[in-house]
């Protein structure tokens, strides 16, 4: 019987150039070819066997603090670069630690929150804010599902995850009003 693949076997290191400070750094990316998609949740949260890909869908520059969901990371106007330098980079304190081999839920949640902060700081589109909030809600659900519900010590953390998930989900919906029929 074959052992289940590890989370690490789905990852690769990729060199990325920061759109703000122009420095190159390595980050973890998903090997898409190895993924086996499971049925999505009712709200279309993507689910895969053996790995939560959402944990690796944010890129964070360790030098200047610019952080965004992968699909938005490289697409910045010169005005947005200026706003990020003024609002994010000046307050950013680089961490001494290197990129972790595996990203845990708490680290991923912090990165998504930083991505949301960057999106607000660069005056990103409401759709980008909404997508970030939706991903954050999904990530919080993933964390909640990974906790042992039978452990009484986890009850408070599970409750907190559920409350934060609902708050970010509500924010995602409020950021993108549905088009009204004409």
Predicted features by range, described:
Residues 23-51:
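Short recognition patches in nucleic-acid-associated and regulatory proteins
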Residues 87-96, 106-114, 124-151, 174:
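Amphipathic alpha-helical repeat scaffolds of TPR domains
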Residues 176-182:
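Conserved small/polar residues in nucleotide/adenosyl-binding loops
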Residues 12-14, 57:
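Short metal-coordination and nucleic-acid-contact micro-motifs, chiefly zinc-binding Cys/His arrays
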Residues 33-43, 76-87:
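Short cysteine/histidine-rich metal-coordination sites, predominantly Zn2+-binding motifs
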Residues 18-21, 61-64:
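Short cysteine-rich clusters marking metal-coordination/redox-active sites
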Residues 24, 67, 179:
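Cys/His-rich metal-chelating microdomains
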Residues 101-114, 158-170:
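Helix-turn-helix repeat elements of alpha-solenoid scaffolds
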């Amino acid at each position: 019987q074959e052992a289940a693949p590890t989370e690490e076997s789905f990852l690769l290191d990729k060199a990325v150039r920061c759109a703000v400070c122009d420095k190159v750094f390595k980050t973890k990316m998903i090997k898409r070819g190895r993924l086996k998609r499971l049925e999505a949740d009712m709200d279309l949260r993507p689910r895969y066997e053996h790995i939560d890909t959402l944990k690796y869908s944010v890129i964070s520059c360790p030098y200047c603090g610019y952080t965004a969901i992968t699909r938005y990371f490289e697409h910045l106007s010169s005005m947005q670069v200026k706003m990020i330098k003024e609002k994010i980079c000046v307050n950013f304190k680089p961490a001494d630690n290197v990129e972790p081999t595996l990203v845990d839920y708490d680290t991923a949640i912090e990165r998504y929150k930083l991505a949301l902060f960057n999106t607000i700081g660069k005056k990103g589109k409401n759709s980008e804010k909404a997508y970030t909030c939706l991903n954050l809600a999904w990530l919080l659900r993933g964390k909640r599902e990974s906790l042992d519900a039978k452990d009484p010590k986890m009850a408070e953390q599970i409750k907190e995850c559920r409350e934060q998930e609902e708050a970010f989900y509500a924010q995602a919906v409020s950021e993108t009003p549905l088009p009204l029929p004409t």
